[in-house]
């Protein structure tokens, strides 16, 4: 459902209006589509909240006189928000369809294979035996690096304490000299 970008009315097409620009506009990155979809969902939530706010603030015609101008203004805002909400849902449907079209050739990977397990049970499948070892090796390496980092920090602290004491002694000698 991609269409080439249209030039603004009354403006000449820019230098990028050639076939390459149109081809680039047609080939939209799936991640960009997902971002657009996320923004569209956020807009839908915002518009829905506005609709509920308008409905909450509207007075019911229960025999009380109300300003018809205010009522008409709120009614037009409500209708406008409903129209925009409908447009946003259509846009979200287009983005969803395009994402499914782009990801149609991909083989879905089971979630269990994406999560590295730490357990070393014999009951698990052999094809998942690699990730637990990788996760445990990575944790061991991180622990070693953290241990070395703590040792270096301790050494630096000792050096700073020694320098502080040395500066204190020098300042004391200079003070006694004067």
From Swiss-Prot:
Keywords: Acetylation, Activator, Coiled coil, Nucleus, Transcription, Transcription regulation. The modification N-acetylserine is found at residue 2. GO terms for biological process: positive regulation of DNA-templated transcription; positive regulation of transcription elongation by RNA polymerase II; positive regulation of transcription initiation by RNA polymerase II; protein ubiquitination; RNA polymerase II preinitiation complex assembly; somatic stem cell population maintenance. GO terms for cellular component: core mediator complex; mediator complex; nucleoplasm; nucleus; ubiquitin ligase complex. GO terms for molecular function: nuclear thyroid hormone receptor binding; nuclear vitamin D receptor binding; transcription coactivator activity; transcription coregulator activity; ubiquitin protein ligase activity. Residues 10-22 have a biased composition (Low complexity). Transmembrane segments: none annotated. Expressed in brain, heart, kidney, liver, lung, pancreas, placenta and skeletal muscle. The keyword Repressor does not apply. Residues 70-94, 133-173 form a coiled coil. InterPro entries: Mediator_Med30_met. It is found in: Nucleus. Residues 1-22 are annotated as: Disordered. Component of the Mediator complex, a coactivator involved in the regulated transcription of nearly all RNA polymerase II-dependent genes. Mediator functions as a bridge to convey information from gene-specific regulatory proteins to the basal RNA polymerase II transcription machinery. Mediator is recruited to promoters by direct interactions with regulatory proteins and serves as a scaffold for the assembly of a functional preinitiation complex with RNA polymerase II and the general transcription factors. Belongs to the Mediator complex subunit 30 family. Component of the Mediator complex, which is composed of MED1, MED4, MED6, MED7, MED8, MED9, MED10, MED11, MED12, MED13, MED13L, MED14, MED15, MED16, MED17, MED18, MED19, MED20, MED21, MED22, MED23, MED24, MED25, MED26, MED27, MED29, MED30, MED31, CCNC, CDK8 and CDC2L6/CDK11. The MED12, MED13, CCNC and CDK8 subunits form a distinct module termed the CDK8 module. Mediator containing the CDK8 module is less active than Mediator lacking this module in supporting transcriptional activation. This is Mediator of RNA polymerase II transcription subunit 30. The lineage of its organism: Eukaryota, Metazoa, Chordata, Craniata, Vertebrata. The gene is MED30.
């Amino acid at each position: 459902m991609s269409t080439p970008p249209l030039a603004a009315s009354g403006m000449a097409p820019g230098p990028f209006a050639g076939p390459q620009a149109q081809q680039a506009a047609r080939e939209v990155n799936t991640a960009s589509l997902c971002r657009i979809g996320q923004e569209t969902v956020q807009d839908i939530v915002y518009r829905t909240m506005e609709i509920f706010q308008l409905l909450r603030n509207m007075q019911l015609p229960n025999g009380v006189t109300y300003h018809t101008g205010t009522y008409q203004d709120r009614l037009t805002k409500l209708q406008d928000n409903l129209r925009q909400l409908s447009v946003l849902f259509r846009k979200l449907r287009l983005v969803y369809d395009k994402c499914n079209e782009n990801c149609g050739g991909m083989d879905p990977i089971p979630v269990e294979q994406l999560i590295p397990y730490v357990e070393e049970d014999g009951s698990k499948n052999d094809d998942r035996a690699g990730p637990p070892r990788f996760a445990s090796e990575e944790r061991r390496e991180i622990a070693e690096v953290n241990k070395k980092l703590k040792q270096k920090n301790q050494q630096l602290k000792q050096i700073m304490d020694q320098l502080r004491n040395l500066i204190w002694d020098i300042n004391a000698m200079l003070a006694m000299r004067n």
